[in-house]
Amino acid sequence: MTLDERKRNILGSIIRDYVETAEPVGSRAMVKKHDLKISAATVRNEMADLEDMGYLEQPHTSAGRIPSERGFRYYVDCMMEKEPPGEREYALLQQLFEQNIEDWEQVILGIAHFLSQMTRYTSFVIVPAVKFTEFRNLQLLPLDQGKALLLLVCDMGVIMHRIISIPEFISSQDLQAITGLFNQAFIGKRLEEVKRSDLQLIRENLSQRRQIIDNALEAIDNLLQNSRDEKVMVSGALNILNEPEFKDMDKLKRILNVLEEDDSLRQIIPGELGEAVDIKIGRENPLEEIKEMSLVVAGYKSFGELGKIGVIGPVRMEYWKAVGTVETVRDIIEDYLKGLG
C-alpha cells in the first residue's frame, strides 16, 4: 500500500524518534520537534489512520504511538536513505586491511569489531571454507630481519599468506633456493600427495636451514587446515545489554545463547543472498528466540564461495546506518579479495 506524502513524513518522524528514545511518540511532541507545518490535531488524526492501516501501534499505557513491524518494513522498503560510514570511519576500515594484510583472520576479527563499534549492535562475519585441489606456486619473500612472508597460491586463484620466522643469516638468495626446492615438491600436487621422502630430501639438502623449512611446513599446514573450515566471528554480543527492550534476564539469556552458538547463528542467516542487503525484521526471523530482533546481512564473494557479514539488533534499529555500514564493508571485502586473486 502506498502512503501519501503527509503520512510518510509522519511515519518517518515517528520511526526516527522512537529509535532514538525507545519511548512512544505523541502528536504534540512531534509538532514541537519537527517542522511538519500542521497542527497536533491533524497529526493525531493521521496517526490514528496509520494505526488502522497497521503501520503504528499504541501501547496500553501510553497515548503515544510506536512503529509496528509492518511500519518498519514499509520504511525500510519504501522510504529509507542509507547512511554509509563517514570519511574518518572509511579510512579506519581501510587501515584494517593495510595493517593486517599478512593475516586474513586478523582482518576478519577487525571487521567484526569495526561493525559492532560503528552500529553499536552485535556483528558477525562468516568466512566460507576455501575449496581447492592443487598447489600452483609458493613464494618466500624477505621482510624485516628474522621474518619472511610465505605466499601459497592454489588453484581458483586462492592466495594464502603467513609471516614466518627465519634465521638472521638467511639471505634473499637462500630464500630463492628454498622456494625452488619447495615448488619442485609441491606444484601440481595435493597436500596428501606430497611424499614424506620429498620433504625429507629438502631438509637434507638444506641442513643448515632446517629451521626455516620446519617453520614453513608448519605454516603451510596451518593455512590449509584453517582454510578447510567455515569460520564464524562474532563481536559486540554484550551490546544488547544497552537496549531497554532486553532488560528481562530470561529473554536476554535466550538471545545471548543464540549469539554465542555458531550453529544457532547459522540458522538465522539466509542460506542464499543476492546483491542487495537482506533485512529480516522481528517475526520474519526463523528462530523464536530472536523474533524481537532484526537482522541485516549481506553476502560477499570469497574465491568462488559465499561469505556473509551483518549485524543483529533490536527491531528498533537504526536501519539506515546498519545497512549503509554493512554494504560498505561488504564492498571493501570484495575489492580486497579481488586484489588477492
Curated annotation (Swiss-Prot):
Q: Which InterPro entries match?
A: GAF-like_dom_sf, HrcA, HrcA_C, WH-like_DNA-bd_sf, WH_DNA-bd_sf, WHTH_transcript_rep_HrcA_IDD
| Entry-linked Pfam families | HrcA
Keyword entries, A-Z = Repressor, Stress response, Transcription, Transcription regulation
Write one Gene Ontology MF term: DNA binding
State which residue ranges cross the membrane. Answer: none
Q: Which residues form the signal peptide?
A: none
Example GO biological process = negative regulation of DNA-templated transcription
User: What HAMAP family does its record include?
Assistant: HrcA
Which purpose does this protein serve, as stated in its record?
A: Negative regulator of class I heat shock genes (grpE-dnaK-dnaJ and groELS operons). Prevents heat-shock induction of these operons.
Q: Which family does it belong to?
A: Belongs to the HrcA family.
The identity of this protein, by name, is Heat-inducible transcription repressor HrcA
Q: Which organism is it from?
A: Syntrophomonas wolfei subsp. wolfei (strain DSM 2245B / Goettingen)
